[in-house]
Design a protein with these regions (language model features):
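Glycine-rich, flexible N-terminal cofactor/catalytic loop recognition
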Residues: 1-59
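Conserved helicase motor
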Residues: 56-62, 138-140
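Glycine/small-residue-rich loop that forms an oxyanion/phosphate-binding "nest" at active or ligand-binding sites
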Residues: 64-117
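Class I SAM-dependent methyltransferase SAM-binding "motif I" and its flanking Rossmann-like core
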Residues: 95-155
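Short active-site oxyanion
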Residues: 26-32, 107-110, 158-159
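Short glycine-rich anion-binding loops that position phosphate/pyrophosphate groups of nucleotides
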Residues: 12-15, 83-87, 165-167, 192
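A contiguous loop/helix-start segment that scaffolds small-molecule binding in enzyme catalytic cores
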Residues: 2, 157-228
Length: 228
């Protein structure tokens, strides 16, 4: 009997954004692979889902991947989730999917159970109407960061990236220093789908000033869009 790995999107804030198919998938899976078992437990408890969880995160090594592959080889149904949103986008899910494809090939099925993505939500709310854009995820903290910043400045396409509350002010300081052409529009989305969802529009300098006044109270993840 062949196993199956399903890539399941989960809410990025509002638990009501869970799809019916995702709920059924999590209930029927033999195990749920999750980035942080404590975060996923909150979601599972809300929907009274009793499926056992297995941690899989950025520090999981080959032994953990081998264990997951063994489960698939024995016919188990596994659901992969991230802390929020769609697995494989700026999280370790992609590494696992790649390893499963490499080691098992067509011996098992890999399916997508799509749903919420902070990337898609922010782009749709921007009002820009992005036909093409460059997505950079989270910029590296040190090595390669300056190269990526130059790429943002020189890209012919609009750019979308993620940032945490700990580094959003630093990022905007760096964007301000890049000296974009006059009229360059930036949108920063914060706490998407949550109670305190908010948006900032303007130049990097204008948004930096707005966020600096609230720096001590900044929470959540940020999506930054730079229109070209």
């Amino acid at each position: 009997m062949s196993g199956i790995l399903r890539i399941v999107a989960t809410p990025i804030g509002n638990l009501e954004d869970m799809t019916l198919r995702a709920l059924r998938t999590l209930k029927e899976a033999d195990f749920i692979l999750c980035e942080d078992t404590r975060t996923t437990k909150h979601l599972l408890d809300h929907y009274q889902i009793k499926t056992s969880t297995i941690s899989y995160h950025q520090h999981s090594g080959e032994l953990k991947i081998d264990r997951i592959i063994d489960l698939l080889n024995t016919g188990k149904s596994l659901a992969l989730v991230t802390d929020a949103g769609t697995p494989g986008i700026s999280d370790p899910g992609g590494k696992l999917v790649s390893a499963v494809r490499e080691k098992l090939g067509n011996a098992i099925k890999i399916e997508s159970v799509p749903g919420v993505s902070a990337l898609a939500a922010a782009v749709s709310l921007s009002g820009v109407g992005f036909d093409r854009f460059l997505f950079l995820g989270f910029l590296p903290h040190k090595k390669g960061r300056q190269t990526m910043l130059k790429q943002i400045l020189t890209s012919e396409y609009s750019v979308v990236l993620y940032e945490s509350k700990h580094r959003i002010v630093k990022l905007l300081e760096e964007l301000s220093a890049l000296k974009f052409p006059d009229g360059t529009e930036v949108m920063v989305a914060r706490e998407l789908t949550k109670l305190f969802e908010s948006f900032y529009f303007g130049s990097p300098e204008e948004i930096l000033t707005a966020l600096q006044s609230k720096e001590s109270n900044l929470k959540g993840e940020f999506v930054v869009l730079i229109k070209k």
